[in-house]
Amino acid sequence: SADTLKAIRQNEAPKPLDLKVADTFELFDQLNKLIHQRKSENVDYQEFVDMIHELLSTNASLSFASEVKSLGLKDADLMLLLWGCNMLVSNNDRVIIPSDYEDLYEGEGLLFSRQVRALKNGSSPLIEKGLFQLMDNDGRAHSDAHTLTSHVCEEILKDLGIASPTEK
């Protein structure tokens, strides 16, 4: 990680990130820190993916971590699901558009393009598994805008007490 490189340059031992947490709220604190690192410290995509897997594995006893792992998503889809969940939990932002997750795939242009295209044409596993849905605005769907489904809010994020998109 960037902290590791900094520590090596300064001839210090790197500080390991403590990924063990007590509950889902703390897990999202850690997830938010990792996302911030990815964006601000130019953490490599694969290194970010590895850190996320370690976070989920270390906290497999939490229902959120086990639910997410049980979905069997490929890395690119899992990262986007977690990115979307973090947007909702951290910023109460339900709308997910490509510019929101462009930083996730920084340096991975082909992967980003594939994700945008799959979401737009409805072939994404996130849509097929009922995790993302097209955003509906006054009866019109927007092909570039998606939201987490009520299933994600009611089942996967249940420990956080987040209201489903249909509840206001």
Show the residue positions of the predicted features:
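Intrinsically disordered, low-complexity N-terminal extensions of AAA+/P-loop NTPases
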Residues: 1-168
